[in-house]
């Protein structure tokens, strides 16, 4: 007997999915490059990139080919064994960065969880069992597990789940004096995003990151860079630490690492990695052949002069459009960020209305993001075409006009 097929609509979400998201009223069904189409065939220019994930756009031929080829070979084997795609990708990351060891997980949360566990364990076994303090920053975002959401400095995400992990201190971002006031020899790690993405697209100052490096060295603490959102070419360098010239002890990567396929990584030195041993940590799916094959293909394209050297010109094209919109509608108080992670802060009269602009953008046929209630965020493909930038920003201008009532 045939099973009756019920139509899938936005209402289906409310009937079957846990209510932890509030998705748009339309359902995307197809993507190509920087364009997306919904169930009704409406086209959108995508400047959201799945929240800085689809770094090469949708359905890039090289990634599709890697997926198909590996999908016909070996999907999953578990970490009882190793596999060739994981070892190839690990070697590429090590050769391109400060790191000497890497471990693969499936999401930014998992990569950060791994980093925080390693930082604490390293301090305990190399220094003292009382060296457990983690210093992090207000408005940071590091994931949704209980540990990572507690390190993230946003109570709206971390409150309401009972006792939190102890010895986590939050201080203002870009405030080195505040860090000095709480830093001591009980500190095992300072955890920072070089660019706070969810927290408003705010970049660290060079002096701040250099100061953190010096404080960590002084107190034998590890400097952990969360580059889940700002890494993998987003800033115009492969990783943001390269732009700043400040080398962390541990770095986490996810999002763009797989170009849209779930994978994350934690990178560190051989000395720090040696604190872990078999059984210290693990993941059933982490480093599976399918994810690593796709990520390897993405890495080979992103880590090229053709891509990285083109990012600043694309950024300037976005900024020029945003400045033109601001001149016409007087809506932005600041345009900031780095590379193709761009934030546009709303003026006081539009504070709290970022999602209004987001929804109006979708109605006009362009996907954008917010970064909190007061900042519009753009995280497009790193290879977005100039024509897509121009058309998408024209659509966004129409959205702005609608919201401001022009």
Swiss-Prot record:
Residue intervals passing through the bilayer = none
Q: Which cofactor does it need?
A: pyridoxal 5'-phosphate
Q: Which InterPro entries match?
A: Ac/SucOrn_transaminase_bac (IPR017652), AcOrn/SuccOrn_fam (IPR004636), Aminotrans_3 (IPR005814), Aminotrans_3_PPA_site (IPR049704), Class-III_PLP-dep_AT (IPR050103), PyrdxlP-dep_Trfase (IPR015424), PyrdxlP-dep_Trfase_major (IPR015421), PyrdxlP-dep_Trfase_small (IPR015422)
EC id: 2.6.1.11, 2.6.1.17
Keywords from UniProt, A to Z, are:
Amino-acid biosynthesis, Aminotransferase, Arginine biosynthesis, Cytoplasm, Lysine biosynthesis, Pyridoxal phosphate, Transferase
Q: In which pathway does it act?
A: Amino-acid biosynthesis; L-arginine biosynthesis; N(2)-acetyl-L-ornithine from L-glutamate: step 4/4; Amino-acid biosynthesis; L-lysine biosynthesis via DAP pathway; LL-2,6-diaminopimelate from (S)-tetrahydrodipicolinate (succinylase route): step 2/3
Residues at which pyridoxal 5'-phosphate binds = 108-109, 141, 226-229, 284
Under NCBIfam families, the record lists:
arg_catab_astC, argD, PRK01278.1, PRK05093.1, PRK12381.1
Q: What protein name applies here?
A: Acetylornithine/succinyldiaminopimelate aminotransferase
The top of its lineage is: Bacteria, Pseudomonadati, Pseudomonadota, Gammaproteobacteria, Enterobacterales
- Which gene carries the instructions for this protein? argD
